[in-house]
Amino acid sequence: MHILVVSVNYRTAPVEFREKLTFQAAELERAMTTLQNQKSVLENVIVSTCNRTEIYAVVDQLHTGRYYIKKFLADWFQLEIEEVAPYLTIFEQDGAIDHLFRVTCGLDSMVVGETQILGQIKDSFLEAQQVKATGTIFNELFKQVITLAKRAHSETTIGESAMSVSYAAVELGKKIFGELTDCHVLILGAGKMGELALQNLYGSGARKVTVMNRTLSKAEVMAEKYMGHAKPLSELQCALLEADILISSTGASDYVITKEMMTKVEKMRSGRPLFMVDIAVPRDIDPAIDELEGSFLYDIDDLQGVVEANRAERLKEAEKIQFMIEEEIVLFKTWLSTLGVVPLISALRDKALAIQSETMESLERKIPNLSDRERKVISKHTKSIINQLLKDPILVAKEIAAEEGADEKLALFAKIFDLEMEDVESRAEEVEHKRAWTPSVPSL
């Protein structure tokens, strides 16, 4: 079994390409189900955000797994593998495990230490569980990763100086306008990104706020929380006439604001500038609008400069979290190494229980007048003796499994206890067969 990550992210691909490889929320479960049926893929979780699309997979062979995951991405987005490959980063084994920990803890984010990615990873994992795309390995790994990420944010101050991308957009607006009290702010999109932007705007003094969304009721709910106004998207052109700051994150598949629309709006704005931030992927605003004299457009990649402002302080805390990650990886790898010894332990227990059962049958033949209570007491105590005798050998077997040359040592272990290796290997095959269909872990 091998753990593999295939990543397209803000470090390796511009937004123009990332938006071509973005899974919509509604299609994520279908995508993971499709990927699960690909050759070599045993488990998978797909994470798709504005800054990254990543496939986490357990595969039976690294080379085969890499190829079929690349092919899946290309086929799904109707591209050629040659078009996709230059933008992919691939992590394998320890590197893949470390990458997942770092991403979930916010250490690989554009804004180091942001917490939004933790929720996105958790949501993707739970969706993968629902479609039975995860098994023994990922159920354990993702549970461990999510738990550590929560602990990292509670035990360090990285979140205090960290910013989400939406917060970075607000900071950029403050640098341009100074105080936001008198600015008319227009929010397009009532999703998580839009609400995060509105929270930060409100916290920075903005009070003239309009929220627009395709579903007006959602815009009304969000606007009411922050004493703003809600309008339907059909009134967008009029709203653009009044706005000073526009932050857009609708999740639409096409441009919500076109250059043609903005050209008409500019003529009626009497030279007033409009600061526009597009934090959607795919983008909501036609990038050609930046050519217009009165429109100042920034997309998600342009926010990198704002993000750097608090970077030094966050990196100090990131070092602490990286140390926590390394400790956790050791624990996971130790657990992973013991999976191979499970069939051996199972065979040892079964042999011991068979001896106990034969002993009880012999005892009952020799002492036929035992009461039910006496049988239960004797059975309980003989099983207790077995458990105590097996406790140390089982611990030793688990320790051996984590050492170099484990196969030879475990073979000797099996020989000492006269265990049939064919039986052990048969049990191992059953474990591998069932691994991808392990019941979901409890909700995190």
Curated annotation (Swiss-Prot):
The enzyme's E.C. designation: 1.2.1.70
What residues make up the catalytic site? 50
At which positions is NADP(+) bound? Answer: 189-194
Reactions that this protein is recorded to catalyse: (S)-4-amino-5-oxopentanoate + tRNA(Glu) + NADP(+) = L-glutamyl-tRNA(Glu) + NADPH + H(+)
Instruction: Tell me the keywords, alphabetical order.
Output: NADP, Oxidoreductase, Porphyrin biosynthesis
Pathway given for this chain reads: Porphyrin-containing compound metabolism; protoporphyrin-IX biosynthesis; 5-aminolevulinate from L-glutamyl-tRNA(Glu): step 1/2
Gene3D superfamilies attached here? Glutamyl-tRNA reductase, N-terminal domain (3.30.460.30), NAD(P)-binding Rossmann-like Domain (3.40.50.720)
The protein's matches in PROSITE patterns, at most eight in alphabetical order, are given as: GLUTR
Name the residues that bind substrate.
49-52, 109, 114-116, 120
Highest taxon in the source lineage: Bacteria
Provide the GO biological process annotations: protoporphyrinogen IX biosynthetic process
Q: What class of enzyme is it?
A: oxidoreductase
Q: Which family does it belong to?
A: Belongs to the glutamyl-tRNA reductase family.
Other comments?
A: During catalysis, the active site Cys acts as a nucleophile attacking the alpha-carbonyl group of tRNA-bound glutamate with the formation of a thioester intermediate between enzyme and glutamate, and the concomitant release of tRNA(Glu). The thioester intermediate is finally reduced by direct hydride transfer from NADPH, to form the product GSA.
Q: How does the record comment on the protein's domains?
A: Possesses an unusual extended V-shaped dimeric structure with each monomer consisting of three distinct domains arranged along a curved 'spinal' alpha-helix. The N-terminal catalytic domain specifically recognizes the glutamate moiety of the substrate. The second domain is the NADPH-binding domain, and the third C-terminal domain is responsible for dimerization.
Subunit structure as annotated in this protein's UniProt entry: Homodimer.
Per its record, how is this protein called by name? Glutamyl-tRNA reductase
Source organism of this protein record = Bacillus cereus (strain 03BB102)
